Amino acid sequence: AVPTETTTTCDGNHVHRLSCDIGVISVQTALYGREDSETCIEGKSLQQISNTECSLLGAVDVLKSRCDGKKVCELSTNIFRPSDPCSDTYKYLQTKYNCFPAIYLVTCEHSVAHLHCDVGQVISVYNADYGRNDHTTCSYERVPSQIQNRDCSNPTSKVAESCSGKNNCTIEASNLVFGDPCVGIYKYLEVAYVCQYPSIV
């Protein structure tokens, strides 16, 4: 069985960071709110931590869409602020995730991604995202304005549509293929996939 990792981040513009040394992130559960009176209590009043039945609906969907299939995923707890489930309670974000054993590929904009499997195996795309989530990936010889937007994400099914079920596959990382989620920003394509033997029906 794949061990489950847990990351907990107290509220207040802190960075919630998930990462996998081997494989890619697969989010299992996510809580934004408060379910106990032990987590993130330093310097807080009893009133701020007494409500232990507070959770934001849909937090797990946000984490899955932003983090599944990536090696590293960072987001601010502030993204949940507009839909605060309990305004008087001091909250935290807690995510449980596994590191799913997949092949992880990054392709800079205008380059071509090559997905391939051993003979007899076919590609099964786990996740794909075209955009920019940090300042460092695909940043060589780029001016700062082209890599400044880190919150540019465009999960896409186009890689799965083009490549799933094939032994090998090429797809260009370009706005023509995926559209442009953030104009003027130099983007990259992240793909996580596994190779498997075709299921015999």
Swiss-Prot record:
Residues carrying covalently attached carbohydrate according to the record: 168
Molecular function via GO: carbohydrate binding
Domain SUEL-type lectin: 18-100, 107-196
Keywords: Disulfide bond, Glycoprotein, Hemagglutinin, Lectin, Repeat
Function: Rhamnose-binding lectin. Also binds melibiose, raffinose, D-galactose, L-arabinose, D-fucose, maltose and D-glucose with decreasing affinity. Does not bind D-arabinose, L-fucose, lactose, xylose or 2-deoxy-D-galactose. Shows strong hemagglutinating activity against rabbit erythrocytes.
Pfam family of the protein (one): SUEL_Lectin
Protein name in the entry: L-rhamnose-binding lectin SML
Coiled-coil stretches: none
Subunit structure, as described in the record: Homodimer; non-covalently linked.
Disulfide bonds: 10-40, 20-99, 54-86, 67-73, 108-138, 117-195, 152-182, 163-169
InterPro entries: Lectin_gal-bd_dom, Lectin_gal-bd_sf
